[in-house]
Amino acid sequence: MSLTADPPACTVPAAGGSSTHKLVNGGAEKIIFKIKSSNNNEYRIAPVFGFVDPSGSKDVVITRTAGAPKEDKLVIHFAPAPADATDAQAAFAAVTPAGTVTIPMSATA
C-alpha cells in the first residue's frame, strides 16, 4: 500500500492563492485518508477526508488566505479503507493509520 502526492510540495503567494495536488494510490487496495495542517488559520484544504481507489487518484486543493510568509506542512494520514465504508470522516475514526505523506508548504512574499 502506497500513497504519493504530485506535486510533492506546495508554494503559494503569502498574499493568497491555491494549489492543486493529486494523491495517487500505487497499491491494489482502496485507501482512506485524513489531512492535517500545521496552519489552520491561513490554509484551507478540500477535501480533508476521502478515499482513493486502487491505482486511482484524488485531487486535493490547498487554498491560502493572506498572511505573513512562513513555512508550514500538510501531513496526510492513510490506511486501508474498511470494505463497507461510505463516509470517510466517520470511517477514519475506526482505522489505525498505516502511513503518512508530508507536503511541505511555502508561502512566499
From Swiss-Prot:
Q: At the top level of its lineage, which domain of life is listed?
A: Eukaryota
Residue stretches in coiled coil:
none
Q: Entry's Pfam families?
A: Motile_Sperm (PF00635)
SUPFAM superfamilies, alphabetically?
PapD-like (SSF49354)
Query: Where, by tissue, is this protein expressed?
Result: Expressed at higher level in testis.
InterPro entries (UniProt xref): Ig-like_fold (IPR013783), MSP_dom (IPR000535), PapD-like_sf (IPR008962), Sperm-specific_class_P (IPR051774)
Per the database record, which ranges form the MSP domain? Answer: 2-109
Q: What is this protein's name?
A: Sperm-specific class P protein 10
Recite the lineage of the species: Eukaryota, Metazoa, Ecdysozoa, Nematoda, Chromadorea
